[in-house]
């Protein structure tokens, strides 16, 4: 089963359905349809860290909030972060995923913070010293596994 071939927009799998490679505009359009993503980085000792965060899209910047800790340390150091968002329907064997690479920075401008707060980015966990992080999209790619015909049968029940 081959899933990714550069410069090909469709890749056939052994299940008879094609995986669609998504262009930049489609990837950016899908991001705000989700509210949870995963931010990832590699620690100095070589371990991969991947943590869920709630986020909003502000133009082409992914914005999330955090408190003191590893995520904020890597932002301060200017390291490249990855960010993944997906929506999957296991019962239908369909879904999409978007992967972003970029650098992040703390958002400190009161005007930017006010605008972000209007986008309703509320933390799920209480943060003592909440910091907004903006991840600039340097590279973005995505794939979609569409629902394939004949897979699902719907049965209506009479009232």
Where are each of the predicted segments found?
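Short beta-strand segments
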Residues: 34-67
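Short, basic/aromatic recognition patches
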Residues: 11-38
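Charged, gly/pro-rich active-site loop segments
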Residues: 2-19, 87-159
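Short beta-turn/strand-loop junction motif enriched in small, turn-promoting residues
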Residues: 36, 44, 69, 88-90, ...
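A short mixed-secondary-structure module that forms the rim of ligand-binding clefts
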Residues: 54-90
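Short glycine/proline-enriched turns and hinge-like loops at secondary-structure junctions
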Residues: 48-50, 75-76, 93-97
């Amino acid at each position: 089963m081959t899933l990714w071939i550069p410069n090909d927009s469709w890749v056939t799998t052994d299940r008879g359905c094609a995986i669609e490679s998504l262009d930049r505009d489609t990837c950016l359009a899908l991001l705000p349809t989700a509210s949870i993503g995963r931010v990832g980085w590699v620690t100095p000792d070589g371990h991969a860290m991947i943590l869920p965060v709630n986020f909003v899209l502000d133009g082409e910047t992914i914005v999330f909030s955090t408190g003191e800790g590893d995520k904020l340390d890597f932002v301060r150091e200017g390291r490249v972060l990855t960010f993944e968002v997906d929506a999957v329907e296991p019962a239908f064997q369909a879904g999409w995923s978007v992967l972003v690479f970029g650098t992040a920075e703390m958002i400190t401008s009161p005007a930017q913070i006010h605008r972000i707060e209007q986008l309703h980015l509320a933390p799920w966990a209480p943060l003592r010293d909440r910091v907004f992080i903006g991840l600039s999209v340097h590279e973005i790619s995505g794939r979609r596994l569409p629902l394939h015909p004949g897979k699902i049968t719907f049965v209506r029940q009479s009232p």
